[in-house]
């Protein structure tokens, strides 16, 4: 299974929601006790960069007035930080990091999506999602997909009304490759 770059955010959203201070304070996060632990494969790195020129989420200050900085929220699969605003930091008894996301980056790989399709032989290229459900407590999610079946690197037939159901910890630990085509038109 390959997910096109502009659609990865739909799956990633469940992880990001579990990283916010509200979820942590309410004990409604499957990542609650996972800081410093492996939550994905070594290829799973999530960078929050508020200083990208013309980035949709760019800014010098966050919603609490703190100066922003680039952060590796997840690096090589290890959860480094949470999104904790000033209010939640006092409730949790920890230092604030930042209240929310800015520009999220999954670093690109070295190979094209076409090369990866050839390597896999047979699979589904997901190019859209239809609804989704993610449980921040458990990490379980399900999402409807649209896409195209590929065989030997060639797109063969469309696929619709199919579901993916998994757990975020399991899903992100199966990340095997990232293509070299980052999607820059989103925050």
Language model regions located:
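Active-site pocket-lining segments that scaffold enzyme catalytic pockets across diverse folds
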Residues: 2-35
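Dual-mode signal for accessory low-complexity, basic/Gly-rich regions
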Residues: 18-19, 34-187
